[in-house]
Amino acid sequence: MASCVGSRTLSKDDVNYKMHFRMINEQQVEDITIDFFYRPHTITLLSFTIVSLMYFAFTRDDSVPEDNIWRGILSVIFFFLIISVLAFPNGPFTRPHPALWRMVFGLSVLYFLFLVFLLFLNFEQVKSLMYWLDPNLRYATREADVMEYAVNCHVITWERIISHFDIFAFGHFWGWAMKALLIRSYGLCWTISITWELTELFFMHLLPNFAECWWDQVILDILLCNGGGIWLGMVVCRFLEMRTYHWASFKDIHTTTGKIKRAVLQFTPASWTYVRWFDPKSSFQRVAGIYLFMIIWQLTELNTFFLKHIFVFQASHPLSWCRILFIGGITAPTVRQYYAYLTDTQCKRVGTQCWVFGVIGFLEAIVCIKFGQDLFSKTQILYVVLWLLCVAFTTFLCLYGMVWYAEHYGHREKTYSECEDGTYSPDISWPHGKGSKGSEDGPHKHPGNSESHSSRRRNRHSKSKVTNGVGKK
């Protein structure tokens, strides 16, 4: 009797909540192609771990202290990634393999712990650590100390404009193409692009390299590099949205060419989500959520410049571009989880990768403030307040413009919940692309296909699904 009283039957809301959170935090693999890659191999990994540790512990030369420390750190990272594959969640993506995204999450946890460790060091210890990683950093200089910015802006010649198309211009272009692939909204991408140029103006008194001529900011940065990258990224998004994916199993492909093509397709998304950051029923919570998204995005970008300015290393140094690539890698699942949290009322909490990304952004800012107190003592509080107000205004203006566009030019359609197949809101409208859209966390179904949707959902329940390498029916 006591056990009956103590037990609690989960309500429908509790079940929906757990299901919705799991869809963005623990995506399951459906339509498994090669069973070997999705079977649990825990005993094999355990044996490999023990044997490899014994081999390196008793056979390598440990007479060089620096090599001992370096190889020990690499071994810790390597085996932590093995634990990540075994224990961490898949996240919202499953292509090319869930193990990859578990390792991405594991690397983000390691970086988070490394930032916590840095907070308990002094500046000399941090610099000694950097010199140990790369002795050439002893002779590094700040770009702002050897270059001039925003000089002779009234002189505009073709030679001067062409000279600005360097490797960094191509970096801007491809960087914004990738950002457009992640955000998938013209309005939000353009808002972030313009807001970043305003951010440079407000923080120009701290970072001299933010000073640019007006034609460099408006024409080269916003219109050509950023705008071209946004256009390319959105074209790719539109192509993926209109494309129908038929993920055939290797067992169903009998030609060598077909098997090779299927292997290449394994490194493309299983499906693509049509993203709607804004809808005509947006509330204050939606505005606040997108405002927070833009603030964290701008903060992450600012950290890139403050870190290399405070700790003195060039933008071309591996410490800079490796961090940029790493942040880009963890941004993909982060944006996906935050979008689901922001747009689906059934998702009551953010995913773990999104949580870790937010902590990393603020920890990097704290590290910059601690070790750059001389720099931040020159901060003009008025500029920071105006920057926050400017971001808030542009967020509201962009949201209002997107809502106005949706109300006047959007097509009224039934829409399904971001994480749930069977629920929709018929009174929300926004512009929709052609064809049926899918997502990494489950295909979006068209309202007219309710019968086929139900049958497909029943069929999916009978297929094998994998979570953290453990297969279950």
UniProtKB/Swiss-Prot annotation:
Covalent S-S links between cysteines: none
Residue numbers carrying N-acetylalanine: 2
One BP annotation, GO: phosphatidylserine biosynthetic process
Catalytic activity: a 1,2-diacyl-sn-glycero-3-phosphoethanolamine + L-serine = a 1,2-diacyl-sn-glycero-3-phospho-L-serine + ethanolamine; a 1,2-diacyl-sn-glycero-3-phosphocholine + L-serine = a 1,2-diacyl-sn-glycero-3-phospho-L-serine + choline
Top EC class for this record: transferase
Basic residues composition bias: residue spans: 455-464
Positions in the Cytoplasmic compartment: 2-35, 94-102, 208-216, 308-319, 377-383
Any one GO molecular-function label of the UniProt entry: L-serine-phosphatidylethanolamine phosphatidyltransferase activity
Keyword Phosphoprotein among UniProt keywords: yes
Chain ranges passing through the membrane: 36-56, 73-93, 103-123, 187-207, 217-237, 287-307, 320-342, 356-376, 384-404
Pathway the protein takes part in: Phospholipid metabolism; phosphatidylserine biosynthesis
Location in or out of the cell: Endoplasmic reticulum membrane
Modified residues (Phosphoserine): 417, 425, 454
Topology within the bilayer: Multi-pass membrane protein
Major localization listed first in the record, in broad terms: endoplasmic reticulum
Region named Disordered: 427-473
Lumenal topological segments: 57-72, 124-186, 238-286, 343-355, 405-473
Any GO CC annotation of this UniProt entry: endoplasmic reticulum membrane
Record bears the keyword Acetylation: yes
E.C. number(s) listed in UniProt: 2.7.8.29
One Pfam family linked to the record: PSS
InterPro entries attached to this UniProt entry: PSS
Function summary: Catalyzes a base-exchange reaction in which the polar head group of phosphatidylethanolamine (PE) or phosphatidylcholine (PC) is replaced by L-serine. Catalyzes mainly the conversion of phosphatidylcholine but also converts, in vitro and to a lesser extent, phosphatidylethanolamine.
Protein's recorded name: Phosphatidylserine synthase 1
Organism (species): Bos taurus (Bovine)
